[in-house]
């Protein structure tokens, strides 16, 4: 892993220098890494502002709304917001089908790309607005694309930030990834179903520890389907819910755990067969 190699190289350099020469390169390296991290953060903020501008254009091209309806067009922060937003969108969905769909699609991807809370409510909302097959495909596609854009942002400009703030955690996860390298897609699916690692952490560290983008996208697309299934089904009874937690029952949790185990079983059997024939 690059994080590990980087620290190893730094340690080797320090051992080869003596006296005052030993401190100068280390200080220069700290300033260099700090500057790189700051520059990366500035670039990320610039990209975020550009994406926010696109979101504003989508909002401006939305159908003409009343003042009361405009106040409800916002990223939902709780179930009341989701209900209010669902009421407005359902009113315009049939007449302005494409506009509503594009607004939903871009908003979901925007939230996923920049790890902004609220996508769980959009998943629930999709079950209220659309037929189940379309809703499930939409949520999986938006999750896969949004996570992949987050991956690409980290690949292009986020590495210094990961090195500076998350290197220890990234090294630990890199070791896990190496153990599952032969069945990586199953491992990604397992992580997406289970809550063991935050999604934002998976997104930004995957390019640093050499998880291929194709595997990352497919693992995410498939892995988010089971939890999304639960949220979308809950969306059919949107107005009976008072919190997002009510969308998840004990039956749902058990089903998710079973699916998580099933996703990792091929890898377990593959390891056992490999040991048997060696």
Curated annotation (Swiss-Prot):
The VTT domain was previously called the SNARE-assoc domain. As there is no evidence that this domain associates with SNARE proteins, it was renamed as VMP1, TMEM41, and TVP38 (VTT) domain. Belongs to the TMEM41 family. This is Transmembrane protein 41B. One of its GO terms (molecular function) is phospholipid scramblase activity. It holds the Pfam family VTT_dom. InterPro entries: TM41A/B, VTT_dom. GO terms for cellular component: endoplasmic reticulum membrane; mitochondria-associated endoplasmic reticulum membrane contact site. The chain crosses the membrane at residues 39-59, 96-116, 132-154, 184-204, 212-232, 249-269. Phospholipid scramblase involved in lipid homeostasis and membrane dynamics processes. Has phospholipid scramblase activity toward cholesterol and phosphatidylserine, as well as phosphatidylethanolamine and phosphatidylcholine. Required for autophagosome formation: participates in early stages of autophagosome biogenesis at the endoplasmic reticulum (ER) membrane by reequilibrating the leaflets of the ER as lipids are extracted by atg2 (atg2a or atg2b) to mediate autophagosome assembly. Disulfide bonds: none annotated. Residues 127-238 are annotated as: VTT domain. Keywords: Autophagy, Endoplasmic reticulum, Lipid transport, Membrane, Neurogenesis, Transmembrane, Transmembrane helix, Transport. It catalyses: a 1,2-diacyl-sn-glycero-3-phospho-L-serine(in) = a 1,2-diacyl-sn-glycero-3-phospho-L-serine(out); cholesterol(in) = cholesterol(out); a 1,2-diacyl-sn-glycero-3-phosphocholine(in) = a 1,2-diacyl-sn-glycero-3-phosphocholine(out); a 1,2-diacyl-sn-glycero-3-phosphoethanolamine(in) = a 1,2-diacyl-sn-glycero-3-phosphoethanolamine(out). It is a multi-pass membrane protein. Residues 1-31 are annotated as: Disordered. GO terms for biological process: autophagosome assembly; nervous system development. It is found in: Endoplasmic reticulum membrane; Endomembrane system. The keyword tRNA processing does not apply. It comes from Xenopus tropicalis.
